[in-house]
UniProtKB/Swiss-Prot annotation:
One of its GO terms (molecular function) is rRNA N-glycosylase activity. The modification N-acetylalanine is found at residue 2. GO terms for cellular component: cytoplasm. It comes from Hordeum vulgare (Barley). Three similar RIP 30 isoforms I, II, and III have been described in Barley. The keyword Hydrolase applies. Keywords: Acetylation, Antimicrobial, Cytoplasm, Fungicide, Hydrolase, Plant defense, Protein synthesis inhibitor, Toxin. This is Protein synthesis inhibitor I. It comes from the Eukaryota. It is found in: Cytoplasm.
Length: 281
């Protein structure tokens, strides 16, 4: 089924910029700023922000841009990311071409030739633990996508390079926004003391977290539901493969929750109403 063409991709709600050579503290500030701007001001879970819901049956219209600069003076690579679910859907190369990861989604864009899921990018989500992350990997990813041209699309090696670059950015920007565990791990790799180590790979628990953002968000939101009179609140259901056994651990793992409707909890309509009433756009 063809994607519904998105609106406002060129009118981002905000733009967050990060210089690849900046400090780990600057990186932490960059990620925290994205979470703060994306949150529904009227919805928190265990003091963690929650995204406003994905509006049903309408084309995506809430976007933000991330500009990643290989050096302070460079123009930078622009990423187009959905503000309702933090999906990376496009990037703009130095020749002004917008490349899209979902065919037909971004007006005027060129399909990159592969999708944005880890299955599309890696062949198997288990391979996430093989992806090296670090400052050099981030710089290489930015350079590869910023320098992409339409002549690269028929080239197998160039397509593979682009897949690897998108995977790196997904982990170091999108997943880092979703998870405090991932952003903390990446910040550690960018720390001056990490010079000898230079790069690192996520472990199995973090891989399970990345693959289970919706499940972990839902599990925490279920504990917020007001119980019937005389009943105690729902206990957090441990997710062993993520290393998350309590609601406190879940809150310490998540950077921002995906909105999920859970029995007895906020409906999509109510959450959207609260979001708009609190000034959300």
């Amino acid at each position: 089924m063809a994607a519904k063409m998105a609106k406002n991709v060129d009118k981002p709600l905000f733009t967050a910029t990060f210089n690849v050579q900046a400090s780990s503290a600057d990186y932490a500030t960059f990620i925290a700023g994205i979470r703060n701007k994306l949150r529904n001001p009227a919805h928190f879970s265990h003091n963690r922000p929650v995204l406003p819901p994905v509006e049903p049956n309408v084309p995506p219209s809430r976007w933000f841009h991330v500009v990643l600069k290989a050096s302070p003076t460079s123009a930078g690579l622009t990423l187009a990311i959905r503000a309702d679910n933090i999906y990376l859907e496009g990037f703009k190369s130095s020749d002004g071409t917008w490349w899209e990861l979902t065919p037909g989604l971004i007006p005027g864009a060129t399909y990159v030739g592969f999708g944005g899921t880890y299955r599309d990018l890696l062949g198997d989500t288990d391979k996430l633990t093989n992806v090296a992350l670090g400052r050099q990997q981030l710089a290489d990813a930015v350079t590869a996508l910023h320098g992409r041209t339409k002549a690269d699309k028929p080239s197998g090696p160039k397509q593979q390079q682009a897949r690897e670059a998108v995977t790196t950015l997904l982990l170091m920007v999108n997943e880092a926004t979703r998870f405090q565990t991932v952003s903390g791990f990446v910040a550690g790799l960018l720390h001056p003391k990490a010079v000898e180590k230079k790069s690192g790979k996520i472990g199995n628990e973090m891989k399970a977290q990345v693959n289970g953002w919706q499940d972990l968000s839902a599990a925490l939101l279920k504990t917020d539901v007001k119980p019937p009179p005389g009943k105690s609140p729902a206990k957090f259901a441990p997710i062993e493969k993520m290393g998350v056994r309590t609601a406190v651990q879940a809150a310490n793992t998540l950077g921002i929750l995906l909105f999920v409707e859970v029995p007895g909890g906020l409906t999509v309509a109510k959450a959207l109403e609260l979001f708009h009433a609190s000034g959300g756009k």
